Amino acid sequence: MRKQIATAALLGAAILAFQAPVQAQDLSKTRYLAANCANCHGTNGQSVGEIASLAGYDKGGFISTMAEFRSGKRPATIMHQLSKGYSDQQIADLAAYFAAQPKK
């Protein structure tokens, strides 16, 4: 019984040890994707111009807006093309990233 508990504890610790680097790597990839948005929407989604800020944007709203750009339902100058370059997972990751950024 003790051997099973020790094995389970060791396995649990190993899972937790490997989970943190994966999350950090995912965040790094998302920041890389978000850097593409910075050209128009500002660093970390905080726009200084007339273009909408993405910082603090609701996750669901971000995903819906990107879907509307993809489908052509929402008018755009460039976003209808850019939105097609991201997978659904990448859009969800960007939505979470920008939602976590403080509004200006």
Give the positions of each predicted feature.
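C-terminal capping alpha-helices of c-type cytochrome domains
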Residues: 71, 84-104
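Residues in well-ordered alpha-helical elements
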Residues: 28, 60, 89-92
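The canonical Cys-X-X-Cys-His
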Residues: 35-43, 94
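Gly/Gly-Pro-rich "capping" loops immediately C-terminal to redox-active cysteine motifs
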Residues: 44-75, 80-84
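Electrostatic cytochrome c docking/interface patches
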Residues: 16-34, 50-52, 63, 68, ...
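Bacterial N-terminal signal peptides that target proteins for export
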Residues: 1-9
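Bacterial N-terminal signal peptides
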Residues: 8-17
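Detector for the c-type heme attachment site
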Residues: 40-47, 99-100
